[in-house]
Amino acid sequence: MRPLPSQLPIPLSPEGYGRFAVEFYKRVAVGILGENLVLSPYSVYKAFAMAYAGASGATREELKAVFGFGEDPCVLPAASRGVEEALSAWLQTDFPFKPNYLNKLRCIGAEAKYVDFERDYKSAIAAINKWAEEKTRGLIKDLVPADYPEGWDVRAVLVSALYFKGNWWPDRFQRVGKREFKGAGPADFIALDLSSCGDPSLRGRASSDLTVVELPFNNTEVALYIIMPRDLPSFVKELTYEKLREIISTLPDQVIRVEMPLFKAEFKGSVKQALREMGVVRAFETADFTEMAYRRLYIDDVFHGAYLNADENGVVAAAATAVVFKPVCAKGGGVEVVVDKPFLFVLADRTSGVIYFIGHVVNPSPGFTPT
């Protein structure tokens, strides 16, 4: 992936991106807390940044409120070192997109690609899916599903992709065999022992109510946070960005050993309903994207795919989001951490707090694929 232009950090206020990231996770997670899940709010945010650049009036204010965008659509975050991102806008060849919108896409760092949805819909969608698959190293396939209604009326698809691969710091974990994981039975566990005098300690704490550990990676400020509450569903229900930020920013350096399972989490599907519940309504109905094109458009659907795999070497994570537009006229300290029960995980920048991936694990064993 090519680097995006130099951009300003996300404003991590409760009203900004951080609030969106946690609320988006909660909206999707509420119905599937009985299975593993990972999402990338950051990928969704970046895809909608391209939509925000073309929005006007009440639609613009709606997106601004939900996602925490600033006044200037070109002022966006650049990903942390080690996190690769790419943006593309797939546009109908003969549709009247405004030159100023194309300029905004360039300043955001998005590549405009022209396809013919009307005359060769299948080839256009195949090209979009191939691009997303390539940018995510083959981890996100068929982003726009094959059963998505075929039709000539698609006019634009805005796509963001994200990829991360990190090796554990200060050392790789070791496999330690099977351990019992609450609610799921035996699972393959890995351990990191830092009990020697010359070893650094990790940030974290352990108690019967809440166990938290920060797992850093080499050559990046991104870290994986494992957050194991007494009861995961209750914890997720009450979770806020402010609470999450407080938990991960006040950890002492006292963890000398970590045991946790190998785990994998995935997601692929539409997130339109979750976004509607968060307040994105006009964009899906009486939309005003008059800064985007000379003809009226609305968002028909939003497809999201995410993947995260953790093993003894580190973490591989990828995500992609596609926002599909159609014309309105066609609308239809000596602490040991043992992670042995359902937990929340967050892949985030340790300094800025930017959340790249967030999810939970209730069964670490099914379908595990080593990196």
Curated annotation (Swiss-Prot):
Site (Reactive bond) location in chain: V328, C329
Entry keywords, A to Z: Protease inhibitor, Serine protease inhibitor
UniProt entry tagged with the keyword Endoplasmic reticulum: no
Keyword Ribonucleoprotein among record annotations: no
GO molecular function terms noted in the UniProt entry: serine-type endopeptidase inhibitor activity
InterPro entries: Serpin_CS, Serpin_dom, Serpin_fam, Serpin_sf, Serpin_sf_1, Serpin_sf_2
Any one annotated GO CC term: extracellular space
Recorded family membership: Belongs to the serpin family.
UniProt protein name: Uncharacterized serpin-like protein PAE0049
